[in-house]
């Protein structure tokens, strides 16, 4: 073999060795790149998944904030509605109460008008009775007035209890029956300074004090303090209600309720 052939063979061998080495190097790098590509794929998926999760959370938070805001607004509107409704209810209650008061006032006015009519009728009839007594010569000094549902007649001619009873009956009246404590206090303010017979006496059959109509009264009397030995008839003065002997002569108090007087 010549020198040129040896040189050519050496060059070819060198080139082929270099090519083989380069081929091996490329083949060695290919799996590494493949591994890198394979390894990079899961990270991309994780990043995408995380992005999706974060986006979903942001959307969820936004929805929650929107709902919270709407709930707060609805709650405020509900409070305003309830407040307005309560105000309307209160106003309606006030209107109903005022209507009821007006209705009661109207009823009271009608009752007062009726009482005034009855009182005027009774006063006219009373004047007729008094005028008749005076014209027949049986008239005596009398003064009278009406208060509430009752009219009072003070016969100033002093008489025993039985004659006072008769004088009242002659005028279609009765000796006064006191209905309650308020009436007693009122009468003590208006009675004359002298003692006045009233329609309360001791009933020997019942062994107790009884009013002229034999009916109970709301006037609470401690009858135990009245000794029958001091008298069996009751009189009224400005300071007290007490008993005395029935033959004593006092002023007479006659009375009559408006609803008992004939129309």
UniProtKB/Swiss-Prot annotation:
The chain crosses the membrane at residues 45-65. Residues 139-258 form the C-type lectin domain. Changing residue 60 to I: In strain: NOD and NOR. GO terms for molecular function: carbohydrate binding. The keyword Disulfide bond applies. Residues 66-263 are extracellular. Residues 1-44 are cytoplasmic. InterPro entries: C-type_lectin-like, C-type_lectin-like/link_sf, CTDL_fold, Ly49_N, Mouse_KLRs, NKR-like_CTLD. Its main location: membrane. One of its GO terms (biological process) is cell adhesion. It is found in: Cell membrane. Glycans are attached at residues 87, 104, 170, 222. Gene3D superfamilies: Mannose-Binding Protein A, subunit A (3.10.100.10). Keywords: Cell adhesion, Cell membrane, Disulfide bond, Glycoprotein, Lectin, Membrane, Receptor, Signal-anchor, Transmembrane, Transmembrane helix. Pfam families: Lectin_C (PF00059), Ly49 (PF08391). Changing residue 45 to F: In strain: NOD and NOR. It is a single-pass type II membrane protein. Changing residue 79 to Q: In strain: NOD and NOR. Homodimer; disulfide-linked. Interacts with the adapter protein TYROBP/DAP12; the interaction leads to natural killer cell activation. Receptor on natural killer (NK) cells for class I MHC. This is Killer cell lectin-like receptor 4. It comes from Mus musculus. The gene is Klra4.
